[in-house]
Amino acid sequence: MGIQPTELSSQDIADEPTLVKQEIAGRSPMQIALTRLRNDKIAMICLFTVLLFVLIAIFAPLLTQMFGVELDGGDPSDDLDQFNFPLIGPPDHGFSWDAPLGISPNEADDNLAQWLYGARTSLSIATVSTLAATLIGVTIGLVAGFSHGWLDKVINFVIDVFLSLPFLLVALALAPIIVSRFGNSPEQLRFWQFTSLLIVLSLFGWMTLARLVRGEVLSLREREFIQAARVIGVPTRRILFKELLPNLMAPIIVSISLGLPAFVTAEAGFAYLGIGVVGVPSWGQTIDKAVPYFNTYPLFLYAPVAGVFLLVVALNLLGDAVRDAFDPKTRR
């Protein structure tokens, strides 16, 4: 019995399953990292918390109006008793919409208004300092990693010198000198107090990133695309900022996410030690004022400490998540 050939009708052919060719879309390392980050629930919670603090800092004037509180102090003769303790608001006199977080002893300032504007001061100083330190560190790291010979050695020596200096002692000595030298008038005093704090934080915040960028550049400069760019005569500046810098975005983003909480903590600590903008509310200055009243009026201290704690924890956890997203090998 032989094999009979079969004929397929057009209908049979139409019924055959067809293979649909689907294009395989490639994803960049940045897209892969963002996908990992979106799937991390803790990272999303921390990101929401950080964004909430940012919105509070931006809209602090509107929020004070919405709650009906004022930044300027109240009347101590009406709102404080004979011992300069509050007569309204929690924790001793119950909740009041006139002072949801109570008022401060001795000055009768509204604690909620001070907290809202303190978030603005702390976040603005930390953000500007982080950006300035990142700019300095990336630039110096690029130059040190791409150069050869004496320039690389000089830059490494400068980095070692800065790392060997005691940060706190130098900051306590340098900031008052800058303020006393340039803050001659009351109008200039506040500006130079703000500037001196930025200078101190930025001056000692770039070294770690510079070394990180230098190490990455030492590896990248031997790659084929960099060698090809040098052979065809591409200018050095274009190689640094158009070829190398885009390949360094991952470690730079990780460094920013981990450096920002450190600057928030440093700003609060320096304000507590007297280095800050006098007359402008900040969490550190509020903590400085509240420490003597810890036993008798603890709410005055709890509010700014809680703000610093929540923001720093959220930023640290978000920074860890960003690092794990860009480098899964570091995941715990």
Q: Which stretches of residues belong to each language-model region?
A:
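Residue-level recognition of transmembrane alpha-helices
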Residues: 50, 114, 156, 172, ...
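Transmembrane alpha-helix boundary and packing residues in multipass membrane permease domains
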Residues: 53, 142, 172-176, 201, ...
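Extracellular/periplasmic helix-loop junction at the C-terminal end of a transmembrane helix
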Residues: 59-84, 170-172, 176-186, 271-273, ...
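Glycine-rich helix-loop "coupling/hinge" segments at transmembrane-helix boundaries
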Residues: 175-178, 265-307
